[in-house]
Amino acid sequence: MEKRLERAMFAGGCFWCMVQPFDKQPGIESVVSGYAGGTVENPTYEQVKTGTTGHYEVVHITYVPELFPFEKLLSLYWPQIDPTDPDGQFHDRGPQYRTAIFYENEEQRALAERSREALEKSGKFKKPIVTSILPMATFYPAEEEHQQFYKKNPMAYKEDREKSGRDEFIYKHWGK
């Protein structure tokens, strides 16, 4: 029997930092860095980093919902980001670094909206939650050097992550 696969996309700032939390989770088949939501077909990193293409840096996740439900993806996603920042994430600034959840179907949309509302009501953040919830957009895989960056370049990844302020923020707000 063939397993049923679903897709999800999450924008959470630099895609380098968004792969590792989802990678190697049981039920997640693939995590691919790339671009979505913009106006340029087959964009390159050089184009997207200008902030003029409308694309988000995203991770595209293929998963088995019976083994790793969408709610679990959401519970991994929120603690990776600052959902109150409309202008980027941590030291990465610009529209390509905004946060968003891209849904594939109405069930995902409803779950994403409920989880955003629950986070808003939790009082965890003083500012409003600005993470967008958007319909699935065309996904363009990023160049090979951006795939699995944390594995290919562990020292550069660690240094970038430390400098970004992401881990301090996560610890302060999520205790992880």
From Swiss-Prot:
One of its GO terms (molecular function) is peptide-methionine (S)-S-oxide reductase activity. It is an enzyme of class 1 (oxidoreductase). It catalyses: L-methionyl-[protein] + [thioredoxin]-disulfide + H2O = L-methionyl-(S)-S-oxide-[protein] + [thioredoxin]-dithiol; [thioredoxin]-disulfide + L-methionine + H2O = L-methionine (S)-S-oxide + [thioredoxin]-dithiol. The keyword Oxidoreductase applies. One of its GO terms (biological process) is protein modification process. The active site is at 14. Keywords: Oxidoreductase. Its EC number is 1.8.4.11. Gene3D superfamilies: Peptide methionine sulphoxide reductase MsrA. The keyword Nucleotide-binding does not apply. It comes from the Bacteria. Disulfide bonds: none annotated. Belongs to the MsrA Met sulfoxide reductase family. Has an important function as a repair enzyme for proteins that have been inactivated by oxidation. Catalyzes the reversible oxidation-reduction of methionine sulfoxide in proteins to methionine. NCBIfam families: msrA. This is Peptide methionine sulfoxide reductase MsrA. It comes from Halalkalibacterium halodurans (strain ATCC BAA-125 / DSM 18197 / FERM 7344 / JCM 9153 / C-125) (Bacillus halodurans).
